Amino acid sequence: MSNSLSKRLFAGMAAASLGLAVTACGGDDKTASNVEYDDTVTVGILHSLTGTMAISESTLVDTEKMAIDEINAAGGVEVDGKKYKIEYIVEDGASDWPTFAEKSKKLIDQDSVPVVFGGWTSASRKAMLPVYESKDAFLYYPIQYEAQECSNNIFYTGATPNQQSEPATKFMYEKSPAAGKPFFLVGSDYVFPRTSNTITKSQVEQLGGTVVGEDYLPLGNTEVAPIIAKIKKALPDGGVIINTLNGDQNVAFFKQIQDAGITPANGYYVMNYSIAEEEISTIGSEFLEGHYGAWNY
């Protein structure tokens, strides 16, 4: 497939996705039946179906497959007067950054896909970026990220800090009843949590608050007890916890902070950047009641 056609199909899929979103908002569920296609185009879907990030990424696979089915039912993607049916190949990134790069190469070189929908963590994206740039293929990246990066081969669809963490930090500063407005930052140990928290530290200082502690866990490590002990020591009278833990680390974290009395009833409020419906159903809503999350629409 020519690079020019790949780019136009890439744009066509984006337009088709937007059209479906607008249709859904309008409540019109009519789709074309018995569609006749002139050709097919295959795309890749590359997320973690196993490992620590599967709790978040497996739902993305289901959502992307559903969107492709809806686009096909609505007539597919039209480029230069030809209708293309979208087919997909699913690969497992296995919560391992080198695997994301290897699977990207496989999808592009062996399966000849022009576009891949993939990744979650910034670590996975940064592992994949050289692959897409060197092969002039395209990656749809679906989640918030730390910004400070721009590539002609990546379509960044998630929020940047000025759209997520900065307004969330201001909200939590204003909400916190604790004297001195103390914050504790906890995250998974990779680029997004560390970069996001660097921005947060500067913002908290400008607002007049204090970052009293900061700690990180290697992604996949669920030994959260030492961090919880540090939070209790640094915030004896309550305060704000900015949480950038990812994957199944959040299951252990929220169950154990409740056991430790780190709850809204005791003046502790957690702001989360990577918890949505999928994680809530696994963690249990009773462990998250009274805490907060910030996402772009």
What are these regions (language model features)?
Residues 1-42, 73:
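Short, low-complexity disordered leader/linker segments with a strong preference
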Residues 45, 107-120, 140-142, 182-187, ...:
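Periplasmic-binding protein-like
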